[in-house]
Amino acid sequence: YNNPEKFDILKKKVDTYSEINKKTWSDDFKKKSKDVYDRFADKGIYMSVHALSRMPRLNKSGYPEIEEKDILDILRGQPNYTEGEKKLIFFDQEGQLVVVKNKETDDIISIVRRKNPKGEWDNV
């Protein structure tokens, strides 16, 4: 590849798929994880294997139901917190949704549900 950016994107996908393939997940879950990765990657959003593993567990009782669209919407905004040197925190209190992005790689490293901000988060 002559285009370093395209090469980096392809390498990220190959590395992510390889990491998924090494998991002891069911073949169905591996396929779903790769499909989610591709849907977000098509929008320029790259998810870690950890974040992908969290996706099916996001809708749980006691929390408002969310869809992939809600994650995309929160990421269109600005992070409202940071955690440590490397983490940008996108927190939607109404949706009780947290998306954590690595400041250096720009990858989504985790997605969790929480009702309130974490004490160690710093306001942006």
PLM features per residue range, with description:
Residues 1-124:
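Ribonuclease/tRNase effector modules and their secretory precursors
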